[in-house]
Swiss-Prot record:
Heterotrimeric G proteins are composed of 3 units; alpha, beta and gamma. The alpha chain contains the guanine nucleotide binding site. Component of the TAS2R14-GNAS2 complex, consisting of TAS2R14, GNAS2, GNB1 and GNG2; within the complex interacts with TAS2R14; this complex plays a role in the perception of bitterness. Interacts with CRY1; the interaction may block GPCR-mediated regulation of cAMP concentrations. Interacts with ADCY5 and stimulates its adenylyl cyclase activity. Interacts with ADCY6 and stimulates its adenylyl cyclase activity. Interacts with ADCY2. GO terms for molecular function: adenylate cyclase activator activity; D1 dopamine receptor binding; G protein activity; G-protein beta/gamma-subunit complex binding; GTP binding; GTPase activity; metal ion binding. It is linked to Albright hereditary osteodystrophy: A disorder characterized by short stature, obesity, round facies, brachydactyly and subcutaneous calcification. It is often associated with pseudohypoparathyoidism, hypocalcemia and elevated PTH levels. Pseudohypoparathyroidism 1A: A disorder characterized by end-organ resistance to parathyroid hormone, hypocalcemia and hyperphosphatemia. It is commonly associated with Albright hereditary osteodystrophy whose features are short stature, obesity, round facies, short metacarpals and ectopic calcification. The modification Phosphoserine is found at S352. Residues 8-23 have a biased composition (Basic and acidic residues). It is found in: Cell membrane. This is Guanine nucleotide-binding protein G(s) subunit alpha isoforms short. The gene is GNAS.
Length: 394
């Protein structure tokens, strides 16, 4: 009688069998997901605001995803094309906004600088008045007169003189690039080039993940906001990353950060690097250091208007290391400047290095696709070794 009480119906047996099979499938999928996860190189992009992190991500899309044709995951060519068209339209608006912000910022700064800057041609004052009048207009529709006034002002020597003093106020890096292209951007059929899209500045808020594959190896790159109030979100990304790519705007030695208009940008980057290098949660994660904006650094050094020693007095005593390898045709002043900045970061990493993580510096220009291709190829072996060490396979 007891046996009869424990007997199972056919339906119950079938249900249990189905449950066991479902559990097996779930377990198998979990194992598969774990293998994929362990085989993926996760790279965390860190750095102070406007250092070029998002531009590095754009380069990965150009080099390893599908350019700017959608996000690179669509199997349907029509869907990819539709996504691409939508993205390009959004980017055209972003580029026009960059152009507007650039001319507004420069003409607004003219009267605020000490000493102030005058227009070379006083007859252009009505153009300045127009630009300032549309400064806060929501959903601005970019009428022809906007481009006419912006172009005339950009050709005014007084406006150019104010632009030359842009380290004294907050101006986006791409200002000159887009102001030089007003005649192209104003066209109704304007389609941005890859270089236009690389130069376009949009504030990164939150965390963005880009997935790509190089020689059948999966990479996930996380780009996070660089402004101070974004940094508290970073800690979510720290868990189990293969490496940190720390991006520095090398040309920012004579600029101050947007957040307080006081702290030197390069000093802010050094302080941030130090806090990351010494963070107890990151003591085993190595850092690939991208000393970025080498093109702008070279321009500043050769122009000779802003001397590094005025901001970092120790530069006056610095000599270029014997093992320095300048680019072909590089001016010795540029070589000395870029190695000084490199060594400021290496001083931090060597002062508190305990052999559990390392710093690998590279000189980069994020808007130069070939430069980023070469640098990333150089980094891949390092990343692979970090990954093997992470899972104790090395």
């Amino acid at each position: 009688m007891g046996c009869l009480g424990n007997s199972k119906t056919e339906d119950q047996r079938n249900e249990e069998k189905a449950q066991r099979e479902a559990n097996k499938k779930i377990e198998k999928q979990l194992q598969k997901d774990k293998q994929v996860y362990r085989a993926t190189h996760r790279l965390l992009l860190l750095g102070a605001g406007e250092s070029g992190k998002s531009t590095i991500v754009k380069q990965m899309r150009i080099l390893h995803v599908n350019g700017f044709n959608g996000e690179g995951g669509e199997e349907d060519p029509q869907a990819a094309r539709s996504n691409s068209d939508g993205e390009k339209a959004t980017k055209v608006q972003d580029i026009k906004n960059n152009l507007k912000e650039a001319i507004e910022t420069i003409v607004a700064a003219m009267s605020n600088l000490v000493p102030p800057v005058e227009l070379a041609n006083p007859e252009n004052q009505f153009r300045v008045d127009y630009i300032l009048s549309v400064m806060n207009v929501p959903d601005f529709d970019f009428p022809p007169e906007f481009y006419e006034h912006a172009k005339a002002l950009w050709e005014d020597e007084g406006v150019r003189a104010c632009y030359e003093r842009s380290n004294e106020y907050q101006l986006i890096d791409c200002a000159q690039y887009f102001l030089d292209k007003i005649d192209v951007i104003k066209q109704a059929d304007y389609v941005p080039s890859d270089q236009d899209l690389l130069r376009c500045r949009v504030l990164t808020s939150g965390i963005f993940e880009t997935k790509f594959q190089v020689d059948k190896v999966n990479f996930h790159m996380f780009d996070v906001g660089g402004q101070r109030d974004e940094r508290r979100k970073w800690i979510q990304c720290f868990n189990d990353v293969t490496a940190i790519i720390f991006v520095v705007a090398s040309s920012s030695y004579n600029m101050v950060i947007r957040e307080d208009n006081q702290t030197n940008r390069l000093q802010e980057a050094l302080n941030l690097f130090k806090s990351i290098w010494n963070n107890r949660w990151l003591r085993t994660i190595s850092v690939i250091l991208f000393l970025n904006k080498q093109d702008l650094l070279a321009e500043k050094v050769l122009a000779g208007k802003s001397k590094i020693e005025d901001y970092f007095p120790e530069f006056a005593r610095y000599t270029t290391p014997e093992d320095a390898t300048p680019e072909p045709g590089e001016d010795p002043r540029v070589t000395r400047a870029k190695y000084f900045i490199r060594d400021e970061f290496l001083r931090i990493s060597t002062a508190s290095g305990d052999g559990r993580h390392y710093c690998y510096p590279h000189f980069t220009c994020a808007v130069d696709t070939e430069n980023i291709r070469r640098v990333f190829n150089d980094c891949r072996d390092i990343i692979q070794r970090m990954h093997l060490r992470q899972y104790e396979l090395l």
